[in-house]
Amino acid sequence: MFHVKHPQREVAATRQRAVGQWPTDPYPRRLNVWPGIRDASMLDGMSAPLQKYSPCSATDKAAALALTPVSSETEARLDAYVDLLVQWQTKTNLVASSTLPQLWTRHIADSLQLLALAPQAKCWADLGSGGGFPGVVLACALADIEGARVDLVERNAKKAAFLREAVRITASPASVHLMDIGDYVDRSEDRIDCVTARALAPLQVLLGFVEPLVNKGAKALFLKGQDVEAELTEATRYWNIEPRIHSSCTGGQGRIAEFDHIERRDRRGARQAWRGS
Protein backbone atom coordinates (compact mmCIF):
# COMPACT_ATOMS: atom_id res chain seq x y z
CA MET A 1 0.00 0.00 0.00
CA PHE A 2 1.42 3.37 -1.03
CA HIS A 3 1.32 6.25 1.44
CA VAL A 4 -0.95 9.17 0.51
CA LYS A 5 0.00 12.68 1.55
CA HIS A 6 -2.97 14.86 2.50
CA PRO A 7 -2.88 18.59 1.62
CA GLN A 8 -2.61 21.07 4.43
CA ARG A 9 -5.51 23.23 3.44
CA GLU A 10 -9.08 22.07 3.14
CA VAL A 11 -11.21 22.56 0.09
CA ALA A 12 -13.10 25.83 0.35
CA ALA A 13 -16.57 25.37 1.72
CA THR A 14 -17.90 27.46 -1.11
CA ARG A 15 -17.11 24.79 -3.69
CA GLN A 16 -20.49 23.62 -4.91
CA ARG A 17 -22.41 22.90 -8.07
CA ALA A 18 -23.85 25.98 -9.71
CA VAL A 19 -27.62 25.91 -9.31
CA GLY A 20 -30.41 28.35 -10.00
CA GLN A 21 -32.93 29.03 -12.72
CA TRP A 22 -30.73 28.24 -15.69
CA PRO A 23 -31.95 25.44 -17.96
CA THR A 24 -30.46 21.96 -17.69
CA ASP A 25 -29.09 22.27 -21.23
CA PRO A 26 -26.07 24.64 -20.93
CA TYR A 27 -26.40 25.63 -24.59
CA PRO A 28 -30.07 26.51 -25.25
CA ARG A 29 -30.80 27.15 -28.92
CA ARG A 30 -34.27 28.65 -28.47
CA LEU A 31 -35.26 31.56 -26.29
CA ASN A 32 -38.28 29.70 -24.95
CA VAL A 33 -36.08 27.24 -23.06
CA TRP A 34 -35.03 30.06 -20.72
CA PRO A 35 -37.31 30.23 -17.67
CA GLY A 36 -39.70 33.18 -17.94
CA ILE A 37 -38.42 34.39 -21.34
CA ARG A 38 -41.03 34.15 -24.11
CA ASP A 39 -39.54 36.29 -26.87
CA ALA A 40 -36.49 38.36 -27.76
CA SER A 41 -38.12 41.64 -26.71
CA MET A 42 -37.88 40.52 -23.08
CA LEU A 43 -34.08 40.74 -23.35
CA ASP A 44 -34.21 44.52 -23.84
CA GLY A 45 -32.63 46.32 -20.93
CA MET A 46 -31.08 43.21 -19.45
CA SER A 47 -27.49 43.37 -18.34
CA ALA A 48 -24.73 42.12 -20.64
CA PRO A 49 -23.70 39.25 -18.35
CA LEU A 50 -27.21 37.79 -18.53
CA GLN A 51 -27.34 37.99 -22.31
CA LYS A 52 -23.95 36.26 -22.51
CA TYR A 53 -24.77 33.13 -20.55
CA SER A 54 -21.88 31.00 -19.33
CA PRO A 55 -22.34 27.54 -17.81
CA CYS A 56 -19.33 28.18 -15.56
CA SER A 57 -20.02 29.32 -12.01
CA ALA A 58 -18.55 32.50 -10.51
CA THR A 59 -18.75 30.83 -7.10
CA ASP A 60 -16.77 27.88 -8.41
CA LYS A 61 -14.16 30.22 -9.89
CA ALA A 62 -13.74 32.01 -6.55
CA ALA A 63 -13.32 28.67 -4.78
CA ALA A 64 -10.71 27.54 -7.31
CA LEU A 65 -8.65 30.72 -7.01
CA ALA A 66 -8.80 30.44 -3.22
CA LEU A 67 -7.23 26.99 -3.55
CA THR A 68 -4.66 27.97 -6.18
CA PRO A 69 -4.11 31.76 -6.17
CA VAL A 70 -2.75 33.37 -9.34
CA SER A 71 -1.81 36.86 -10.47
CA SER A 72 -4.38 39.13 -12.09
CA GLU A 73 -2.55 38.69 -15.41
CA THR A 74 -2.79 34.91 -15.17
CA GLU A 75 -6.45 35.15 -14.18
CA ALA A 76 -7.16 37.22 -17.29
CA ARG A 77 -5.45 34.62 -19.48
CA LEU A 78 -7.42 31.84 -17.82
CA ASP A 79 -10.67 33.76 -18.33
CA ALA A 80 -9.94 34.01 -22.05
CA TYR A 81 -9.11 30.32 -22.18
CA VAL A 82 -12.29 29.31 -20.37
CA ASP A 83 -14.44 31.46 -22.67
CA LEU A 84 -12.83 29.83 -25.70
CA LEU A 85 -13.31 26.34 -24.29
CA VAL A 86 -17.01 26.97 -23.66
CA GLN A 87 -17.42 28.17 -27.26
CA TRP A 88 -15.62 25.16 -28.74
CA GLN A 89 -17.36 22.69 -26.45
CA THR A 90 -20.52 23.03 -28.54
CA LYS A 91 -18.79 21.41 -31.54
CA THR A 92 -15.82 19.52 -30.07
CA ASN A 93 -15.93 17.35 -26.96
CA LEU A 94 -13.13 18.89 -24.88
CA VAL A 95 -14.45 18.10 -21.38
CA ALA A 96 -17.49 16.31 -20.02
CA SER A 97 -20.30 18.87 -20.33
CA SER A 98 -21.58 17.86 -16.90
CA THR A 99 -18.37 19.27 -15.36
CA LEU A 100 -18.74 22.78 -16.83
CA PRO A 101 -20.41 24.26 -13.70
CA GLN A 102 -17.32 23.14 -11.74
CA LEU A 103 -14.80 23.80 -14.51
CA TRP A 104 -12.64 26.08 -12.38
CA THR A 105 -12.21 23.67 -9.46
CA ARG A 106 -12.55 20.42 -11.40
CA HIS A 107 -10.12 21.37 -14.18
CA ILE A 108 -8.35 24.72 -13.64
CA ALA A 109 -7.34 24.33 -9.98
CA ASP A 110 -6.65 20.64 -10.52
CA SER A 111 -4.09 21.66 -13.15
CA LEU A 112 -2.61 24.65 -11.31
CA GLN A 113 -1.72 22.60 -8.23
CA LEU A 114 1.05 20.85 -10.19
CA LEU A 115 3.14 24.03 -10.07
CA ALA A 116 3.64 23.61 -6.31
CA LEU A 117 5.10 20.14 -6.86
CA ALA A 118 7.67 21.38 -9.38
CA PRO A 119 8.31 25.02 -8.42
CA GLN A 120 11.63 25.27 -10.29
CA ALA A 121 10.41 23.69 -13.51
CA LYS A 122 10.30 25.99 -16.54
CA CYS A 123 10.11 23.53 -19.42
CA TRP A 124 7.07 21.27 -19.38
CA ALA A 125 5.65 18.61 -21.68
CA ASP A 126 1.95 17.72 -21.47
CA LEU A 127 1.13 14.40 -23.10
CA GLY A 128 -2.32 13.94 -24.62
CA SER A 129 -3.27 17.57 -23.95
CA GLY A 130 -6.84 17.23 -25.26
CA GLY A 131 -8.77 20.25 -23.99
CA GLY A 132 -5.65 21.80 -22.46
CA PHE A 133 -5.60 20.32 -18.97
CA PRO A 134 -3.13 20.70 -17.47
CA GLY A 135 -0.94 22.01 -20.33
CA VAL A 136 -2.67 25.25 -21.37
CA VAL A 137 -3.44 26.13 -17.75
CA LEU A 138 0.23 25.70 -16.83
CA ALA A 139 1.28 27.81 -19.82
CA CYS A 140 -1.07 30.61 -18.72
CA ALA A 141 0.49 30.56 -15.25
CA LEU A 142 4.06 30.47 -16.59
CA ALA A 143 3.63 33.22 -19.18
CA ASP A 144 5.52 35.80 -17.11
CA ILE A 145 8.43 33.46 -16.34
CA GLU A 146 11.45 34.09 -18.55
CA GLY A 147 12.40 30.99 -20.51
CA ALA A 148 9.21 29.09 -19.68
CA ARG A 149 7.89 26.66 -22.29
CA VAL A 150 5.11 24.09 -22.46
CA ASP A 151 4.91 21.46 -25.21
CA LEU A 152 1.33 20.35 -25.85
CA VAL A 153 1.29 16.90 -27.44
CA GLU A 154 -1.99 15.86 -29.07
CA ARG A 155 -2.71 13.50 -31.98
CA ASN A 156 -6.34 14.55 -32.55
CA ALA A 157 -6.39 17.25 -35.23
CA LYS A 158 -9.53 19.01 -33.96
CA LYS A 159 -8.23 19.20 -30.42
CA ALA A 160 -4.83 20.35 -31.67
CA ALA A 161 -6.58 23.17 -33.56
CA PHE A 162 -8.31 24.21 -30.35
CA LEU A 163 -5.01 24.13 -28.46
CA ARG A 164 -3.37 26.39 -31.06
CA GLU A 165 -6.19 28.91 -30.74
CA ALA A 166 -5.98 28.77 -26.94
CA VAL A 167 -2.25 29.46 -27.08
CA ARG A 168 -2.84 32.34 -29.49
CA ILE A 169 -5.53 34.16 -27.53
CA THR A 170 -3.78 33.75 -24.18
CA ALA A 171 -0.33 34.64 -25.56
CA SER A 172 1.07 31.77 -23.53
CA PRO A 173 4.54 30.22 -24.03
CA ALA A 174 3.34 26.93 -25.48
CA SER A 175 3.64 25.04 -28.75
CA VAL A 176 1.34 22.36 -30.13
CA HIS A 177 2.77 19.10 -31.44
CA LEU A 178 0.26 17.21 -33.60
CA MET A 179 1.71 13.71 -33.30
CA ASP A 180 1.66 10.48 -31.34
CA ILE A 181 3.20 10.63 -27.88
CA GLY A 182 5.78 7.98 -28.71
CA ASP A 183 6.98 9.97 -31.72
CA TYR A 184 7.24 13.15 -29.66
CA VAL A 185 9.28 11.46 -26.95
CA ASP A 186 11.55 9.73 -29.46
CA ARG A 187 12.23 13.00 -31.33
CA SER A 188 12.43 15.32 -28.33
CA GLU A 189 15.84 16.94 -27.95
CA ASP A 190 14.93 20.01 -25.90
CA ARG A 191 15.24 20.09 -22.14
CA ILE A 192 12.16 18.94 -20.23
CA ASP A 193 11.95 19.66 -16.50
CA CYS A 194 8.53 18.14 -15.90
CA VAL A 195 6.23 15.88 -17.93
CA THR A 196 2.51 15.62 -17.22
CA ALA A 197 -0.57 13.68 -18.27
CA ARG A 198 -4.19 13.74 -17.15
CA ALA A 199 -6.86 11.10 -17.73
CA LEU A 200 -4.77 9.61 -20.53
CA ALA A 201 -3.74 6.00 -19.86
CA PRO A 202 -2.93 3.53 -17.06
CA LEU A 203 0.25 4.25 -15.10
CA GLN A 204 2.19 1.30 -16.52
CA VAL A 205 1.64 2.75 -20.00
CA LEU A 206 2.47 6.33 -19.02
CA LEU A 207 5.72 5.19 -17.44
CA GLY A 208 6.67 3.53 -20.70
CA PHE A 209 6.14 6.78 -22.57
CA VAL A 210 8.00 9.05 -20.17
CA GLU A 211 10.89 6.75 -19.26
CA PRO A 212 13.34 8.45 -21.69
CA LEU A 213 12.43 11.91 -20.37
CA VAL A 214 12.63 10.93 -16.69
CA ASN A 215 15.98 9.24 -17.24
CA LYS A 216 17.22 12.57 -18.64
CA GLY A 217 16.23 14.36 -15.44
CA ALA A 218 12.54 15.22 -15.87
CA LYS A 219 9.99 14.81 -13.10
CA ALA A 220 6.74 13.04 -14.02
CA LEU A 221 3.43 14.21 -12.54
CA PHE A 222 0.29 12.28 -13.44
CA LEU A 223 -3.18 13.42 -12.40
CA LYS A 224 -5.12 10.28 -11.51
CA GLY A 225 -8.34 9.22 -9.80
CA GLN A 226 -9.58 6.62 -7.38
CA ASP A 227 -7.92 3.71 -9.21
CA VAL A 228 -4.37 4.94 -8.63
CA GLU A 229 -3.54 2.22 -6.08
CA ALA A 230 -4.62 -0.55 -8.45
CA GLU A 231 -2.67 1.09 -11.29
CA LEU A 232 0.45 1.31 -9.14
CA THR A 233 0.17 -2.36 -8.24
CA GLU A 234 -0.07 -3.26 -11.91
CA ALA A 235 2.79 -0.91 -12.83
CA THR A 236 5.17 -2.69 -10.45
CA ARG A 237 4.95 -5.74 -12.72
CA TYR A 238 6.88 -3.77 -15.33
CA TRP A 239 8.76 -1.08 -13.42
CA ASN A 240 10.88 -0.54 -10.34
CA ILE A 241 9.40 2.67 -8.98
CA GLU A 242 9.23 4.71 -5.78
CA PRO A 243 6.22 6.96 -6.35
CA ARG A 244 5.02 9.76 -4.13
CA ILE A 245 1.24 10.02 -4.07
CA HIS A 246 -0.42 13.34 -3.22
CA SER A 247 -4.09 14.03 -2.57
CA SER A 248 -5.58 16.65 -4.86
CA CYS A 249 -6.15 20.05 -3.27
CA THR A 250 -9.59 20.02 -4.88
CA GLY A 251 -10.71 17.20 -2.63
CA GLY A 252 -12.57 14.08 -3.61
CA GLN A 253 -10.68 11.05 -4.89
CA GLY A 254 -8.18 12.91 -7.07
CA ARG A 255 -4.53 11.93 -6.69
CA ILE A 256 -1.21 13.04 -8.17
CA ALA A 257 1.40 10.37 -8.82
CA GLU A 258 4.94 11.78 -8.78
CA PHE A 259 7.97 9.95 -10.20
CA ASP A 260 11.63 11.00 -10.23
CA HIS A 261 13.09 7.62 -11.13
CA ILE A 262 11.87 4.82 -13.40
CA GLU A 263 13.67 1.55 -14.00
CA ARG A 264 12.40 -0.97 -16.51
CA ARG A 265 11.71 -4.45 -15.15
CA ASP A 266 10.25 -6.12 -18.27
CA ARG A 267 12.13 -5.71 -21.55
CA ARG A 268 8.90 -5.81 -23.51
CA GLY A 269 7.98 -2.47 -21.95
CA ALA A 270 4.56 -1.37 -20.83
CA ARG A 271 3.62 0.12 -24.20
CA GLN A 272 3.58 -3.35 -25.76
CA ALA A 273 1.92 -4.85 -22.69
CA TRP A 274 -0.98 -2.37 -23.03
CA ARG A 275 -1.56 -3.56 -26.59
CA GLY A 276 -1.87 -7.11 -25.31
CA SER A 277 1.33 -8.47 -26.87
Curated annotation (Swiss-Prot):
Compartment(s): Cytoplasm
Principal EC category: transferase
Q: Which Gene Ontology terms cover its molecular function?
A: rRNA (guanine-N7-)-methyltransferase activity
**Pfam families given for it?**
GidB (PF02527)
Q: Which SUPFAM superfamilies match?
A: S-adenosyl-L-methionine-dependent methyltransferases
Provide the reaction this enzyme catalyses. guanosine(527) in 16S rRNA + S-adenosyl-L-methionine = N(7)-methylguanosine(527) in 16S rRNA + S-adenosyl-L-homocysteine
Q: Which GO terms describe its cellular component?
A: cytosol
Where, in this chain's numbering, is S-adenosyl-L-methionine bound?
G128, F133, S188, E189, R198
Under Enzyme Commission nomenclature, its number is: 2.1.1.170
The answer to whether the entry has keyword Cytoplasm is: yes
Q: What does the UniProt keyword field contain?
A: Cytoplasm, Methyltransferase, rRNA processing, S-adenosyl-L-methionine, Transferase
Provide the function of this protein. Answer: Specifically methylates the N7 position of guanine in position 527 of 16S rRNA.
Similarity remark: Belongs to the methyltransferase superfamily. RNA methyltransferase RsmG family.
What is the name of this protein?
Ribosomal RNA small subunit methyltransferase G
Name the source organism. Answer: Nitrobacter winogradskyi (strain ATCC 25391 / DSM 10237 / CIP 104748 / NCIMB 11846 / Nb-255)
